[in-house]
């Protein structure tokens, strides 16, 4: 019987080795597998290479992993934001390596790994520092740069629902990099809001087939923290 579910986030990230390359889904906070990241921090793996769209927000999620000094190198598109103080401090101190990749190239390099493509030519980045050391070619009068696929040992992603076979459905913008990362990693670990019985997922709605998923853990959404406003406080 195929059953890819595990009981806890700790069990989901068990066995991740020091020095692993890990893709982490999310576009900012949308689709960020925060509970899996917290479990990874507790698990203790170090010297990691992280692939993500950015380099963390505030001091939670990916930023918490950076702050715990578990990351040696990060591959991303938007490392600096108004609340990227953890990344900024580590990078300026020389404690974190950065490979900057244009967002479209990042998505396609990940997709190429999952599709078995050995590389692709793109005009994005030609003539800039991002193209230094890479093969270039002129095709039909236009200049291109050869980009290589990005493979990973693990992918940590977030989905809305799954069944025990690992079939996934995402919620709106939380989908982002999840599907391509799932196909590009040797081991894909997914946190979901709800695990449903086989047959409950509409086959036409499944985005990531279970063949790309290794482990699934159900994580109930946290209750929102709402502070009473001034008007509410006045009437207490």
Protein language model annotation of sequence segments:
Residues 1-236:
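Conserved alpha/beta enzyme-core scaffold
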């Amino acid at each position: 019987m195929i059953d890819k579910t595990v009981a806890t986030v700790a069990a989901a990230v068990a066995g991740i080795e020091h020095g692993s390359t890990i893709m982490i889904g999310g576009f900012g906070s949308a689709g960020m597998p925060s509970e899996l990241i917290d479990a990874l921090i507790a698990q203790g793996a170090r010297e990691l290479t992280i692939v993500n769209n950015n380099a963390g927000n505030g001091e939670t999620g990916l930023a918490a992993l950076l702050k715990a000094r578990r990351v040696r190198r990060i591959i991303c598109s938007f490392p600096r934001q108004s609340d990227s103080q953890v990344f900024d401090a580590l990078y300026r101190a020389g404690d974190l390596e950065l490979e900057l990749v244009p967002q479209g190239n990042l998505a396609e390099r990940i997709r190429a790994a999952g599709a078995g493509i050995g590389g692709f030519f793109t005009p994005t980045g030609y003539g800039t520092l991002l193209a230094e050391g890479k093969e270039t070619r002129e095709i039909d009068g236009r200049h291109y740069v050869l980009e290589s696929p990005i493979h990973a040992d693990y992918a940590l992603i977030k989905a809305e629902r799954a069944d025990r076979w690992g079939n996934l459905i995402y919620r709106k913008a939380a989908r982002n990099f999840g599907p391509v990362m799932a196909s590009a990693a040797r081991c894909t670990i997914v946190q979901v809001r709800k695990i449903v019985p086989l047959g409950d997922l509409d086959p036409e709605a499944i985005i990531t087939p279970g063949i790309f998923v290794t482990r699934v853990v159900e994580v109930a959404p946290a209750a929102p923290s709402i502070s009473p406003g001034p008007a509410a406080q006045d009437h207490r």
